[in-house]
Amino acid sequence: MEMGRLVFGLCLILIVGTFLEFSGGATAAKGVTYDGRSLIIDGQRKLLFSGSIHYPRSTPEMWPSLIKKTKEGGIDVIQTYVFWNLHEPKLGQYDFSGRNDLVKFIKEIRSQGLYVCLRIGPFIEAEWNYGGLPFWLRDVPGMVYRTDNEPFKFHMQKFTAKIVDLMKSEGLYASQGGPIILSQIENEYANVEGAFHEKGASYIKWAGQMAVGLKTGVPWIMCKSPDAPDPVINTCNGMKCGETFPGPNSPNKPKMWTEDWTSFFQVYGKEPYIRSAEDIAFHAALFVAKNGSYINYYMYHGGTNFGRTSSSYFITGYYDQAPLDEYGLLRQPKYGHLKELHAAIKSSANPLLQGKQTILSLGPMQQAYVFEDANNGCVAFLVNNDAKASQIQFRNNAYSLSPKSIGILQNCKNLIYETAKVNVKMNTRVTTPVQVFNVPDNWNLFRETIPAFPGTSLKTNALLEHTNLTKDKTDYLWYTSSFKLDSPCTNPSIYTESSGHVVHVFVNNALAGSGHGSRDIRVVKLQAPVSLINGQNNISILSGMVGLPDSGAYMERRSYGLTKVQISCGGTKPIDLSRSQWGYSVGLLGEKVRLYQWKNLNRVKWSMNKAGLIKNRPLAWYKTTFDGPNGDGPVGLHMSSMGKGEIWVNGESIGRYWVSFLTPAGQPSQSIYHIPRAFLKPSGNLLVVFEEEGGDPLGISLNTISVVGSSQAQSQFS
């Protein structure tokens, strides 16, 4: 009986779902308020499903398709952060071009009839470099981030007002008839508030009042901030907000979930986190059953951390396990199963938003959440929390529910959806090589010069902090020194400690060893044998970062780089060079001359491949050219033959790669790196790779990316 009802109900939903609207389209929004049940847009309650898409993690050419697929998945709102360090890379100098064109992104959302939740922050975390804060903030005198600190509050308010004024000037707030129905100030402040003591509480109160004072005409939210001041709405982030969120801090605020994690971030050396479609659907349905009226999937499309935008140790692909993968392809059954959930819930929006809730116990681990109204009908959520299937009696009918599942009863009778029953077929992503770069004569090589102490312009008698010198303009800083050996040294070795992410140690121009940390190991310790000569010996150590941190209290106090250098001779006491004279060189020559651009290729002397010498060279720049693949589908570079570095295509960085950092299963965390079609020309594309460790460019391949199996959200009920 239940299966017949399920088939009938889903058929009906999928037929009428396209035409179902609660109270008008996004482009007609004139005002947004709220009460304890939901947001109210143009005087009508809204039950909203939202999906996070971050505009700089894809290209403007991708935005229309991503938004279209998101809308077709039953999503009403697109939620995005605003990226301060992209928009104000230098104090007072703003950039809203290309992937940074926030206005264009929002207007595209509006053109497709969806709403926007604009998370201004401007601290955002987001696994983004420095949590979105521009690095120049650290050099402002007296600066302490995210607390009751006047320098920080000044710059935070200035940027927040800049974004609000930009949105107003384009008429993009709902109060102006635009699509923006919500704005967010700050981000997950509960994680750090205790570290600032009473200044944390006063800061969050100030932040809320400052935001409200900007008069956007739409509500402000704070995620993971239980003490959000009125009228700011505090919201939940997590995987199980239906179980963990006690609700907003006022009965007059709606229950909202701003981050329902569809997967989880991934760092180098770790496997991807796989969250099932069934689990996401269960907790989303439970949140609605418990009076939730806004759910945002974080991420709905993750995209790519182009350039150096990822935070410490995070891979370049972002939330690839989302309903729309890194390339914007449907990930089934996650996409389709959630689409059916949205349709099922929206079919009963009226009783959900207008009806009275009743909670019934139907067994030791079974409940019913019933919403009923004489004028608006009835809907019930039957919840089975048991690890085994359960037969549930409800209103004189029997329903069989799978383990850990929620069934949705339209009209409190017809079982139209069950979270644990997936009707959408799984698809599989396929990579197809279209070109292997295995012709040696097609590659050219340029090797970085290893600097020596005498040639450096900055010298001190101490090991300086890495980012104080680089200002986050580059990942790299050379530490150079020299010492004289007057007596024989048996079994010589060098020992280094670093709070940076990577070190490459050269002694007398020979690589002695390399080491790196991880998200879990914060201090890099390296002991390596070396060859020394009588007389003067040169030490050159390349310190590397893999992104700045994205979270935590007192981020402005974090320090990185070398902290100890010692030379040992057999069993004798080590020679501590930490307080010797050190010289510094910021960045790489190839970076300084922008060797990845066509116009700068002749600024260095490239070598042709000779007898295989192009392989396994540390600190090497490689270049070649290639033609773009036919078609318009996604494209990626397979980099499994390389080690660690960065990739540019026609001058655009597609991100860092680190395929030598293996997971416990012995595989790279990421092997294929996305090249957006917008970066490509039909022919004559320039590929430049900087390799830190040593790899074989002859093993790199160009691939097209596609899916086989279910490419649309179709099921046996459609």
UniProtKB/Swiss-Prot annotation:
Residues 1-28 form the signal peptide. It is found in: Secreted, Extracellular space, Apoplast. One of its GO terms (biological process) is plant-type cell wall modification. Its EC number is 3.2.1.23. Glycans are attached at N291, N468, N538. Keywords: Apoplast, Glycoprotein, Glycosidase, Hydrolase, Secreted, Signal. One of its GO terms (molecular function) is beta-galactosidase activity. Pfam families: BetaGal_gal-bd, GHD, Glyco_hydro_35. Expressed at low levels in siliques. Gene3D superfamilies: Galactose-binding domain-like, Glycosidases. The active site is at E188 (proton donor), E259 (nucleophile). It catalyses: Hydrolysis of terminal non-reducing beta-D-galactose residues in beta-D-galactosides. One of its GO terms (cellular component) is plastid. Belongs to the glycosyl hydrolase 35 family. This is Beta-galactosidase 6. The lineage of its organism: Eukaryota, Viridiplantae, Streptophyta, Embryophyta, Tracheophyta.
